[in-house]
A protein has these predicted regions:
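Hydrophobic pocket-lining residues within nucleotide cofactor-binding pockets
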Residues: 6, 16, 101
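Vicinal oxygen chelate
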Residues: 2, 33-35, 53-56, 64-69, ...
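Core segments of cupin and vicinal oxygen chelate
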Residues: 12-63, 110, 129, 148
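Short, solvent-exposed beta-strand edge segments and adjacent coil->beta transition regions
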Residues: 6-8, 89-93
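Residues that cap or flank secondary-structure elements
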Residues: 10-11, 96
Length: 151
């Protein structure tokens, strides 16, 4: 048995419309949307009465997917502390490679993203930053600045 691929990542959000706008600003497109409920989703989540509204987004290259989920029932539960700091245990961030870091950062900031530190350069390879995005998620943006991008 081996993993075939990473199918998608899920981000639970309070404001689904704002989250879709945030990630759409980075070029992601809506692949699907729906309301989910029933015995199967209760069993998968280990909770009763689960009702969610989801939007599935796809990256421009077609290889990555992000599921934005808004729980309608049971109620959302805030992380403590909220938002979680970068050194909190668990899933830390999602990183996207972008063309034009400045433009990508401007686009997400216009949609509520907050730059967490500074834009920094890692050697001669990447310019990158962390942005606090929808639901307090850490969204990393990285621009490949290598002259020879075959590495």
């Amino acid at each position: 048995m081996t993993i075939k691929r990473l199918d998608h990542t899920v981000l639970v959000v309070e404001d689904l419309e704002a989250a879709v706008a945030f990630f759409s600003a980075l070029g992601m497109t809506v692949e699907g949307e729906g309301q989910l409920s029933g015995d199967w989703i209760d069993r998968v989540n280990g909770m009763d009465g689960v009702r969610v509204h989801i939007v599935l987004l796809r990256t421009p290259d077609g290889n990555g997917r992000l599921e934005l989920t808004r729980f309608q029932s049971p109620e959302l539960v805030a992380q403590t502390p909220s938002p979680a700091p970068p050194n909190a245990l668990g899933l830390r961030s999602v990183m996207f490679e972008v063309d034009g870091l400045g433009a990508a950062l401007d686009a997400v900031q216009r949609r509520g993203g907050v730059l967490m530190g500074d834009v920094a350069q890692y050697e001669d390879q990447y310019r990158l930053c962390y942005v606090r995005g929808p639901g307090g998620a850490i969204v990393a943006l990285a621009e490949d600045i290598r002259q020879d991008r075959s590495s």
